Amino acid sequence: MIKPIMKDPIFLAQKSAPATVMDLPIAQDLRDTLEAHRDGCVGMAANMIGAAKRIIIFDDNGSATVMFNPEIVKCSGAYEAEEGCLSLPGTRKTKRYRSIKVQYQNEKFETRLKTYTGFTAQIIQHEIDHCSGVLI
């Protein structure tokens, strides 16, 4: 189901709780909402649709990928980026890394470890920040 975009900075600044198998329906809501905003959005976190759970979705070279409980375990190649967000007006500068290694659970709640680089890595960092209550 397409959900409205949360814009309340107090809600968005809260840390999200770990996701469980009971939160699988949130992943579908994220898919539907990301698809509805595909012209101006490449990733979302569950708190952006009002669910304070550690779930993100992002465009991974044309395919939507969902991660439950993502954590960056390694990063390298710091740089300054300028980013926008559906939940906040305008753009802001922030520190990002060119390469990240992420541990997460897939939609079967199997633990995975994968390295991402470039723009995809930047998207993932932005969405994991949302899960941690960090707003750009």
Place the predicted regions along the sequence by residue.
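Positively charged
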Residues: M1-I136
